[in-house]
Amino acid sequence: MKTIHVTASREYDVVIGAGLLNECGQRIAAAVPGAEKAVVYTDTTVFPLYAKRVTDSLKAAGFTVLQDYFLAGEHSKTFRNWERILRFFTENRVSRSDVVVALGGGVVGDMVGFAAACYQRGVRLVQIPTTLLAAVDSSVGGKTAVDLPAGKNLIGAFWQPSLVICDTDTLQTLPDAVRRDGCAEIIKYGVLDGTALFSRLENSLPDEIPEDILARCVEIKRDIVAADEFDTGARHLLNLGHTAAHAAELLSDYSLSHGSAVAMGLCSMARACAARGLCTEEDAARIEALIKKCGLPTELPYTAEALANAALSDKKRAGSTLPVITVEGLGRCTVRKIAASDYAGWLRQGGAK
């Protein structure tokens, strides 16, 4: 078992290990003293798999447990469903001293976390990620959001959890496509961290993802969040590959998975940086080869103009400038502010038509 301590506006632990769902109640009780009710919110995929195990553990720890779920998938991450969660809180007289438990993947964590952030100006939150992507990325760092028709994660808040529990048993039976999605974010961390981690990933992905690799990804995010909790500068590094990814997701009406989009965006940026002499062709080729090895796509399916136009809705844009995260070598990534009108050129150099 690994425990990573996060220091932000709220300090908390990220606990990673096998069999943690069975003991989650006691851990949650220790993290949120005084809470009487625990509201477990999940989706239609996770509910039949893990909800009973979590609720039984919470009841054994003395909580009064409420539970609800919504339809799985990015299309559920809407203002309407977020409002439905808030109505559930009010109908069941949840108080600020209680705790909300987000049990599931990134969509669950984002939307339930945003509801917790807003309800009565903030109720305590515990994240229990059940996908690889959520475990290494979205459950940590406090970003919560829902989507709008104009773009991804355009309404949201920073709301740090009180605890993150990652039971690695839930990651062993993921469908291949969901596992691949998580590999995309892990590769991103390898590029950010450097040759040592990236070389390990080349040897282990996609078949083996040891606990210490999960922990290292969380540590990387922890350190970046500690330096820039509210995403005004250094935290943009975590968006490596994500500007093109979010644009592609929007253009696909969210039929394209987040991990697939990140893989495409990461390949595109690595190629563009190699073309501009910012990184070596060898580094770009290694990134693309690892993405292919994991069974992830490497080519953006939309034109550079369409992607650049969609990127104008990106929440990181500041007026006429758009921050892009460039690859200048493994372990050497930089936030560069470019004219939004120049972004199509980067995309073309990355392979978009």
Task: Pin down the residues of each PLM region.
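ATP/NTP phosphate-donor binding region
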Residues: 1-98
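A glycine/threonine-rich phosphate-anchoring loop and its flanking beta-alpha core
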Residues: 15, 114-205
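Solvent-exposed alpha-helices and their adjacent loops that cap or buttress functional pockets
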Residues: 93-95, 118-119, 147-148, 155-158, ...
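Short glycine/serine/threonine-rich phosphate/pyrophosphate-binding segments
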Residues: 107-114, 135-136, 247
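Generic secondary-structure signature for well-ordered alpha-helical cores
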Residues: 160-164, 169-176, 184-196, 203-206, ...
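C-terminal charged capping/lid subdomain of soluble metabolic enzymes
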Residues: 184-187, 278-353
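Active-site segments that bind and position negatively charged phosphate/pyrophosphate groups
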Residues: 199-306
